[in-house]
Amino acid sequence: HCTPNSNHCW
């Protein structure tokens, strides 16, 4: 899942 808010994926 990725978060455009922090720009990271896990």
Curated annotation (Swiss-Prot):
GO cellular-component term (any): extracellular region
Chief location of this protein within or outside the cell: secreted
Keyword annotations: Amidation, Calcium channel impairing toxin, Disulfide bond, Ion channel impairing toxin, Secreted, Toxin, Voltage-gated calcium channel impairing toxin
Disulfide cysteine pairs (residue numbers): 2-9
Modified residue annotations for Tryptophan amide: 10
Function, in words: Concentration-dependent partial inhibitor of Cav3.2/CACNA1H (IC(50)=1.18 uM) and Cav3.3/CACNA1I (IC(50)=0.49 uM) depolarized currents. In vivo, in a mouse model of post-surgical pain, it produces antiallodynia for both mechanical and thermal pain.
Protein's UniProt name: Omega-buthitoxin-Hf1a
